[in-house]
């Protein structure tokens, strides 16, 4: 049984860059993809593979062999259409687990309907975690 997983992270904004770095530091195989060559260059030392490319192009994804990855993370949260196309392509190419970033509840619903296994709204989740910790300072931070 393999102890590490392979991840494809699409989008190298703050969220995508941080997720990919942490997954790589945990010993996983991580490929990142973004259309911005500067962001790809910055990430290249913190991941297994860094690629300049457009995840909205299914043929680009197919050529990279993304169907071999255990999990695809769509970290394009600002553009509904870009994240929808990337999610749809990853789903159609057979990635077994797809996690997406959304910017609001409507975006989240659309991504779930497309077949995303999990959708996070980072600002909402972080705000809830902060409010809980401020309201209950004696609770362990891991709760």
Where are these regions (language model features)?
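Cytosolic regulatory regions of ion transport systems
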Residues: 1-143
């Amino acid at each position: 049984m393999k102890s590490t997983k392979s991840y494809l992270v699409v989008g190298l904004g703050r969220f995508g860059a941080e997720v990919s770095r942490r997954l790589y530091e945990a010993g996983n195989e991580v490929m990142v993809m973004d259309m911005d060559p500067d962001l790809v260059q910055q990430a290249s030392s913190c991941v297994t593979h860094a690629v300049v490319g457009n995840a909205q192009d299914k043929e680009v994804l197919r050529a990279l062999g993304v169907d071999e990855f255990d999990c695809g993370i769509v970290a394009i949260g600002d553009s509904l259409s870009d994240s929808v196309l990337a999610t749809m392509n990853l789903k159609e190419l057979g990635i077994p687990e797809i996690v997406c970033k959304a910017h609001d509840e409507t975006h989240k619903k659309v991504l779930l309907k497309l077949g995303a296994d999990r959708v996070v709204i980072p600002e909402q989740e972080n705000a809830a975690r902060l409010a809980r910790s401020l309201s209950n300072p004696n609770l362990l931070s891991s709760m």
